[in-house]
Amino acid sequence: MMGKIAYGLAGLLAFVVCLGVANGASQLEFPVWDRHYTGTIAGKAVNVGITRINGDLHGSYCYEPCNQRKMRLILSGSLQDKRLLLEERAQTLSGQWDAEISPSEIKGVWTSADKKRHFPIALRYNKPKGDPDIDLVLVAEVNDDYDPSKAIDCNNVPVISAIKLYRDGKLIQTLNTASIGTCSIFTPQWRDVNFDGYPDLSIPQELPAGPNIPEQTWLYDPSTQRYVDAPASYQEITSPEPDAEYKQIVSYWRGGCCSHGVDIYRWKGKEVELIDSGSSYRQPVLSKGKMYTCYVIPSYHDGRIFYLQKRKNGHLTPPFTDVEGCEPFELTTNIRTVIQPEKPGMEPESIEIKWQGNKSSPGEFCPLVPFVEGDKISPRLVTNKDIPDICISRNEFKAMSK
């Protein structure tokens, strides 16, 4: 993703880092990149991701076809000039890599943990479309919380104060920032966030309770060939994910232990606007005569927000039969049944709890709950016989209705 790595530049930076720290400098600099490779190990197709932070490397890979069920082997090691040395682990050490890396490929030898088997490694760098051919160097602050003589870990993480952009070994721009990871540093990412055909640059700022990760983003201005701050309306979005197909920005968020959702934004001129939002709710469910509430978070795909249930030929689909992870029903906030709208742009149907008089106990008002039962909605009046003290008096009902 970073284009051609200037090895001479990296060597010079390593010298500057050592010299600066030795002389008590308050900053150090190191190159970073994230790369995706495909190719073969022992003739078998693999998919590889590697991140470089100065001379340290980490990443993972899997044998094709990769999917969620396939285990990814964990990679860690170092880059010494053009020599790449990695250990791979699947819980325990499973192999070692010794290879040469160039701007376009990795070639070398894989050796088993017992050193009895040796196979060729042949990987090609999948250069992203529109790659800006810019090398990135991070400027890190050396202070009481970071000791550069020790490995970066949860107790030793530097604050990144700037990103330097180089092309062909020449500094073209410096972007000031304030980024600090929890147990490692964040690496910048190239993404076209405003869908103008030019890659923009982003870096996370910190790691709060996920997924609310704030990012700092710079947009590429082709008229000046410089990177400029994205507008505040974009910077305020946490964990933004550009959807290039629909030209939208998607943000999954968390408002607490029991509040999650997804927002959709779209560019309007030089600003972004919120165009849709979906939040979590508690779905009431009847299953085998028992009452439950199931926590549901809407999802995003195909350019729109999707809810769990939709109507088809008068029935709900998919039928709600799995109550694993659901809780026994109790009256809490945000209980409702939500039905997916038939067409994009339409509002979802939201069926709330209503309070209704209990004919079996005059003067008592109980919740009429829109339970989903299999493939249909089964409203049920939940009384004190079901759950003690769930109903309210007439006076309480009048006060609530005002």
Feature-to-residue mapping (PLM):
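Bacterial N-terminal signal peptides
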Residues: 10-18
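Bacterial N-terminal signal peptides that target proteins for export
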Residues: 1-10
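Beta-propeller blade termini
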Residues: 184-193, 235-248
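Acidic, small-residue rich beta-repeat scaffolds with periodic aromatic anchors
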Residues: 26-27, 31-33, 56, 82-157, ...
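Acidic/hydrophobic-patterned starts of short beta strands in beta-sheet-rich repeat architectures
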Residues: 193-205, 245-250, 351
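N-terminal glycine/threonine-rich, aromatic-flanked beta-hairpin/loop signature
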Residues: 39-78, 310, 318-332, 336
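Short coil/turn segments at the loop-to-beta-strand junctions that recur within blades
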Residues: 180-184, 232-238, 279-283
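Structural motif
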Residues: 210-217, 258-263
